[in-house]
């Protein structure tokens, strides 16, 4: 009898909660109006959007739902934040990013550097993924428009509120790509100096194709998309009401369950990680004291991570070779290189990312199957 598949790639995307799917359906067939319309159908859609905005604001601890600007996802939110900061910070033509940002930030920065003459400071990290704080502070000046530092990577999380305060001391705005962090870390943005934050619904059991940019009240802003007056004139384009309603409900559910879920998930993660490390020939990546509760990233020595992924997939187990946004490349990811993972292990990086759906029985099956796979893939020692 075929066993059910096991999904351990929740940092790439998550299963949409059934309640979320059910909540979205009426907005396709009954409350299908344009939220900008002045009749009853538009009003119903507008109510759905307001409820979603309130839920997202509550999840991240924003001071007001008016600080939430809906977008098509994290990439749009990131691009909007950085381009806006450069536009409103007159005369400041430098930005600060980390060496381990998402490609959406890295490629935008490279484009700004090449085509618009923006100077980009790329701050390195150490072998645990911790930001070089001295280099960050040295890069801050009255020429910097914005510092954009990811809140959590697939392997670690950073002291973002502290970094925001230091950016403000230099007169710079602060943005954080929190796509991997929202729903996995408790947040209270109202108590921080963070100016802008990006999030994406599909990372916390909402639908794909929707996200948001948190924009702190009073922060100067220049829209990226112009045209209609949607999102209080800050983002043109008819809102995807069904998906945004779904993201809002996902935010409600995750916020209500976060403390209990994260505790249970971290316990399962630690058990899985201990079991794999006990097999030998691998090392844990990231700062064990500051990382996402659901994530276990390991580097296997002298083993190709793509081969591990393929063999586990054949057994019905889904994992990732680090980051799904970079998988398929035949070279170590930029994060692996930035963390100076030893050459013999750099091609063996795999990521197990759990969710509230993950069970101990599923992880037991992984631990039962993995030793045989590693034995097949590990080179046979040469004897004299």
Swiss-Prot record:
PROSITE patterns: AA_TRANSFER_CLASS_5 (PS00595)
Origin: domain of life: Bacteria
Named cofactor requirement(s): pyridoxal 5'-phosphate
Positions of modified residues (N6-(pyridoxal phosphate)lysine): 203
Enzyme Commission number, as recorded: 2.8.1.7
Ligand binding (pyridoxal 5'-phosphate): 74-75, 154, 180, 200-202, 238
Catalytic activity, as annotated: (sulfur carrier)-H + L-cysteine = (sulfur carrier)-SH + L-alanine
Sites where the protein binds [2Fe-2S] cluster: 325
GO biological process, one term: nitrogen fixation
Pfam families per record: Aminotran_5 (PF00266)
Catalytic residues identified in the record: 325
Gene Ontology terms for molecular function: cysteine desulfurase activity; iron-sulfur cluster binding; metal ion binding
Task of the protein: Catalyzes the removal of elemental sulfur atoms from cysteine to produce alanine. Seems to participate in the biosynthesis of the nitrogenase metalloclusters by providing the inorganic sulfur required for the Fe-S core formation.
Protein family according to the UniProt entry: Belongs to the class-V pyridoxal-phosphate-dependent aminotransferase family. NifS/IscS subfamily.
Subunit structure: Homodimer.
Protein name: Cysteine desulfurase
Source species of the chain: Rhodobacter capsulatus (Rhodopseudomonas capsulata)
